[in-house]
């Protein structure tokens, strides 16, 4: 389903509010872990009790993001959460990773009109995502996976897989 993310007043206001909260979060002293968690608990749709997202962190709405217990994200995590983005328990995200639910139509008239779509992303339990990985709209990564650095994940990855590449593909079972 296509929607107008660029000119829909409500969505623009929600993204602006989220940007302000992300800015506030990114300006908190790194050593003030409790304040950082407090801000993220207000911003994100659901969090586990124990989690840490290193600064800087950016997202579009925040309320579409769910993180499980013992979630850790290193610096420069970007989550474009036009749809639900769910991370399981014990997920480790290395630096400079992006999770992109948003996509744009191939039709030039629709695209230039500002229309886009969003598809959910699901990351299972016990997953390690290497540095500079891009996870694209609609992808599910199963439990116990390792995604190698620099990968572009365009299709689902089954549980218990080592996968890497551009496009990302399963290398072997682990």
Residue ranges and their predicted role:
Residues 1-50, 168-171:
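Terminal amphipathic alpha-helical/low-complexity segments used for targeting or macromolecular assembly
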Residues 131-156:
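Beta-rich strand-turn-strand
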Residues 157-167:
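Acidic, glycine-centered active-site loop in nucleotide-sugar glycosyltransferases
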Residues 57-67, 72-140, 166-174:
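Flexible, glycine/small-residue-enriched loop-and-beta-strand segment within the central core
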Residues 128, 146, 162-164:
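Short-chain dehydrogenase/reductase
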């Amino acid at each position: 389903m296509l929607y107008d993310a660029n000119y829909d007043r409500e969505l623009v206001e929600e993204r602006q509010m989220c940007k302000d909260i992300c800015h506030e979060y990114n300006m908190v002293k790194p050593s003030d872990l409790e304040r950082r968690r407090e801000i993220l608990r207000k911003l994100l749709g659901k969090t586990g009790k124990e989690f840490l997202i290193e600064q800087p962190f950016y997202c579009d709405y925040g309320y579409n993001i769910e993180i499980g217990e013992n979630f850790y994200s290193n610096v420069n995590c970007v989550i474009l959460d036009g749809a639900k983005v769910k991370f399981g328990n014990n997920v480790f995200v290395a630096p400079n990773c992006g999770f992109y639910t948003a996509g744009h139509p191939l039709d030039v008239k629709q695209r230039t009109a500002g229309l886009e779509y969003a598809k959910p992303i699901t990351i299972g339990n016990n997953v390690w995502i290497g540095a500079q990985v891009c996870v694209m709209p609609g992808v599910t990564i199963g439990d116990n996976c390792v995604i190698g650095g620099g990968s572009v994940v365009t299709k689902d990855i089954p549980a218990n897989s080592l996968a890497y590449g551009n496009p990302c593909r399963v290398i072997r079972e682990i």
